[in-house]
Amino acid sequence: MKRIIFLMLGWGLCLIVQAQTTNFSKLNFGCDGSSTTSGNQWSKTVVDLLGFASHHNVAVGSSTFACHPDTQDYNSDNFAGISDGWKPTKDKKELQMRHNNVSKVHIQKFISEVKDGVYPAPDVFVFAMGSNDTKLDGVAEALSARTLDDVNVTTMAGGARWAIQTILENFPECRVFVWLPIPVSYTHLRAHETGRNL
């Protein structure tokens, strides 16, 4: 079901971007997300169908917008790496790598790869994540922070604000699209299940 929704959203993105320009061969595509975006999934299909010049995807399964208190910066000297692991473990390095699997670190990696010339600067960037986030509070705080240094990145809203604004500040000509999951209450889920069983 999630793949169908993302494919529909991807097709919608294609239509929006196509309305703005007809020649995608000179445009570069970047994206960040979780498991539904990682690798060569919907984003690669969009790039191939529309003929974008490049595809730069830093999405990793199990990722979140919200950082952990011990999340490391991508360029820090002791950076442990990033892991999409999800099975229970007590391995300290693996746990640190999982705590680094957040949009802030992905975006730091993305910018580093662009600055190093590995990939070109993006003309279109899509964030497609949030389904793994559990810290959904802090929206007002994230929006009212004056600078990125003031943003509390340990919430979904703060992490999203930091990531989106960082892309816009580093690539001001880039068009940014954000696809978030639509949260559903437990009551709604139970009603849906009850209706489906009738």
Stretches with model-predicted labels:
Residues 1-20:
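Bacterial Sec-dependent N-terminal signal peptides
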Residues 23-150, 154:
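Conserved SGNH/GDSL esterase-like catalytic core that processes O-acyl groups on lipids
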Residues 45, 49-50, 166, 170, ...:
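Alpha-helical structural signal in soluble globular domains
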Residues 51-56, 158, 171-174:
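Structural alpha-beta junctions
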Residues 126-136, 140-141, 163-190:
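Active-site segments of SGNH/GDSL-like serine hydrolases
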Residues 156-163:
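A general structural detector for well-ordered alpha-helical segments in enzyme core domains, enriched
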Residues 188-198:
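Single conserved hydrophobic/aromatic residue that forms the stacking wall/gate
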